Structure formats: structure tokens, C-alpha cells
């Protein structure tokens, strides 16, 4: 398992989700309820990617700390 590749993939997906937010905020009339729902969904996707990436990095750090502590 290549951890760097996994983190890079998650970072790329988070970047794409961030771009989707920019597109939704700039391109549409935010007074339209449908546009607001789409923007909210894009924000939720971005938040989910960031939280998942953060949790994964913390899990790896904790695992490595546990291994080092046992050495």
C-alpha cells in the first residue's frame, strides 16, 4: 500500500470538490433554491473529503507512533 499515492489521490479529489464549489458559487444565481441545494451539496462533498483525508492521516500517524513506541 503506497500511502503517498493514497494521500495524493484524496488531495486531488478534495481539490476537484473545491473547484466544484467555486463553479457553483460563481456560475449560478444563488437566490434560486435549486442552485443553493447544488452549492450546499458541493460544500458537503468538500467537507467530507477533507475530514476523510484528515482521519486517514491521523490513523497512519497513530499506527506509526504505536509501532515506534513498541520498538
UniProtKB/Swiss-Prot annotation:
InterPro entries: T3SS_needle-like (IPR021123), T3SS_needle-like_sf (IPR037203), T3SS_needle_YscF (IPR011841). Induction: Expressed when residing in the host ileal loop, host macrophages, and when in an acidic environment. Repressed by methyl-3,4-dephostatin. GO terms for biological process: protein secretion by the type III secretion system. It comes from the Bacteria. Keywords: Protein transport, Secreted, Transport, Virulence. Its main location: secreted. It is found in: Secreted; Cell surface. It holds the Pfam family T3SS_needle_F. Transmembrane segments: none annotated. One of its GO terms (cellular component) is extracellular region. Belongs to the SctF family. The core secretion machinery of the T3SS is composed of approximately 20 different proteins, including cytoplasmic components, a base, an export apparatus and a needle. This subunit polymerizes and forms the helical needle filament. Component of the type III secretion system (T3SS), also called injectisome, which is used to inject bacterial effector proteins into eukaryotic host cells. SsaG/SctF2 forms the external needle filament that protrudes from the bacterial surface. During infection, can induce innate immune responses. The needle proteins interact with host TLR2 or TLR4, and induce signaling by NF-kappa-B and/or AP-1. This activation is MyD88 dependent and results in increased expression of cytokines, including TNF-alpha, IL-6 and IL-8. This is SPI-2 type 3 secretion system needle filament protein.
